[in-house]
Amino acid sequence: MVLADLGSRLRGALSSVESGSDDEIQQMIKDICSALLESDVNVKLVAKLRGNIKNKIDESNVSKETSAMNKRKKLQKIIFDELCALVDSNVEPPKPKKLSTSTKTINGKKVRLSKESSHVIMFVGLQGAGKTTSCTKLAVYYKKRGFKVGLVCADTFRAGAFDQLKQNAIKANIPYYGSYLEPDPVKIAFEGVQKFKQEKFDIIIVDTSGRHRQEEQLFTEMVQIGEAVQPTQTIMVMDGSIGQAAESQARAFKESSNFGSIILTKMDGHAKGGGAISAVAATKTPIVFIGTGEHVGDLEIFKPTTFISKLLGIGDIQGLIEHVQSLNLHQDEGHKQTIEHIKEGKFTLRDFQNQMNNFLKMGPLTNIASMIPGLSNIMSQVGDEETSKKIKNMIYIMDSMTTKELECDGRIFIKEPSRIVRVARGSGCAVVEVEMILQQHRMMSTMAKSAMAAQGGQPGQPGNPMANNPQMQRMMQQAQSNPNFMQQAMNMLGGAGGGAGGAGGLAGMMNNPAMMQQAQQMMRSNPQMMQQAQQMMKNPGMMQKMMQQFGGMGGM
């Protein structure tokens, strides 16, 4: 997760408030300010934040609240609003639109006609900030959303720049334009943009040379490229690891190139990212994306409220739904088959294997967990590499199963235990690991069938007959009528199985947007529910008692 340490400290400061006394509130403010300063946020910005928080606490009469829970709610709202204001530039960046085209036959050939012009994006920034990689990431981002995107390499200054962009573009299957022979970047940029405009591309991204403020020749070249291609939007790519120095860098660049928005890169491995975000926001320039890794999919759209929600552990269910939808998992044949099986009231081991494969496609576990309310506290303690390794190991074990075994509901292993031994030997693992997978499959099967039954047999369509009742009352009624309800809730939160086991329930939940929205509603309706869930996940004995009260572990 981006800025995991800062998020952990902010959540710790908020959770330290129990009774809501003045001393606790003052200590909370002190801890929040210390965390921000250590993340390289400017001292003046932190001082302003501290003053705003104190003023709002006085104005909202927090101290007069008799309920400790109401005090915590008000404090969380105040902190949330002020942190959002800290990273919000209050400027809306331009958004590209698809070209509305019509087809006309000219001289026997079909030609696409459009009254609109392509959205041209020019990238600028210092050397080594990650412009070329960010160009490809942005192209992939828009391509997934149905835009026709082209890349133009106008970087003739750095050796290997065109090779890098070409390699990235081919890997991502994105059209590109560049030249090994033409030394004039202005000519390359102009010809590339004209080529893609004639072919009616929705978005054209132009990569330029990295430059420093002292290199007047390169800055002149940048201005000339801008005049040649007439960009709709100019994006400056900045290294997030420079912290609050981002402000002076952005101001210096803006004097020469009137860029409209910023992409912050390398935000996944540096503690100073918070300082960079707040510093850029102070220049009233919107941050449109943040780079969170080396892969082409590691680019997150930046929204202040969403970003702060993740930091504070509130989650971003809508963002998670959009992320899952962008992967087009619903078009996968294996996923379609799984849905059909669940409709028929069955869930095979192959379906379970498909769910595990889909889960790996979603990206690092901590990034996904940060979008689910309350999970970032727990999953921040789990390594992405270790978790992915466990999930892959589960897939390897299932690869050692026969077609007959994969197509069954797991009962064949109960009837013929010798199959478990054979699968263990074939995959080079212990018998107990195979048994754990079968156990997780049974839990996932129960959850999938129950979710389908609750939605009237239609995946992704909420159909709860008690929708008009309060959320907690509905939850309790479900718990009473469904012995496996608590187990399913723990599965949705990534628990109940421990380690890689919890991934099955989480993957199933993320393939079902309606279930994710219901989970978020339950969390919001009862703030104590998440705390209780976390305590249960940390205390296996407590959770076991809860399971026994609700009728065992689902037939395990």
Curated annotation (Swiss-Prot):
GO CC, alphabetical: cytosol; endoplasmic reticulum; signal recognition particle, endoplasmic reticulum targeting
Alphabetized UniProt keyword annotations: Cytoplasm, Endoplasmic reticulum, GTP-binding, Hydrolase, Nucleotide-binding, Ribonucleoprotein, RNA-binding, Signal recognition particle
Region annotation G-domain: where it falls in the sequence: 1-312
Reaction catalysed by this enzyme: GTP + H2O = GDP + phosphate + H(+)
The UniProt record lists the keyword Ribonucleoprotein: yes
Annotated region (M-domain), positions in chain: 313-556
Residues the record lists as binding GTP: 125-132, 207-211, 265-268
InterPro entries assigned: AAA+_ATPase, P-loop_NTPase, Signal_recog_part_SRP54_M_sf, Signal_recog_particl_SRP54_hlx, Signal_recog_particle_SRP54_M, SRP/SRP_N, SRP54, SRP54_euk
Region (Disordered): 450-470
Coiled coil: none
Classification via CDD domains: SRP54_G
EC number annotated for this UniProt entry: 3.6.5.4
Keyword Metal-binding tagged: no
GO MF term set: 7S RNA binding; ATP hydrolysis activity; endoplasmic reticulum signal peptide binding; GTP binding; GTPase activity
GO terms (BP aspect): SRP-dependent cotranslational protein targeting to membrane, translocation
Subunit field text: Fungal signal recognition particle (SRP) complex consists of a 7S RNA molecule (scR1) and at least six protein subunits: SRP72, SRP68, SRP54, SEC65, SRP21 and SRP14. Interacts with SRP101.
PANTHER family: SIGNAL RECOGNITION PARTICLE 54K PROTEIN SRP54 (PTHR11564), SIGNAL RECOGNITION PARTICLE SUBUNIT SRP54 (PTHR11564:SF5)
Domain notes: The NG domain, also named G domain, is a special guanosine triphosphatase (GTPase) domain, which binds GTP and forms a guanosine 5'-triphosphate (GTP)-dependent complex with a homologous NG domain in the SRP receptor subunit SRP101. The two NG domains undergo cooperative rearrangements upon their assembly, which culminate in the reciprocal activation of the GTPase activity of one another. SRP receptor compaction upon binding with cargo-loaded SRP and GTPase rearrangement drive SRP-mediated cotranslational protein translocation into the ER. The M domain binds the 7SL RNA and the signal sequence of presecretory proteins.
Purpose of the protein: Signal-recognition-particle (SRP) assembly has a crucial role in targeting secretory proteins to the rough endoplasmic reticulum (ER) membrane. SRP is required for the cotranslational protein translocation for ER import and preferentially recognizes strongly hydrophobic signal sequences. It is involved in targeting the nascent chain-ribosome (RNC) complex to the ER and is proposed to participate in the arrest of nascent chain elongation during membrane targeting. SRP54 binds to the signal sequence of presecretory protein when they emerge from the ribosomes.
Family membership: Belongs to the GTP-binding SRP family. SRP54 subfamily.
Protein name: Signal recognition particle subunit SRP54
Organism listed in the record: Candida albicans (Yeast)
Lineage per the UniProt record: Eukaryota, Fungi, Dikarya, Ascomycota, Saccharomycotina
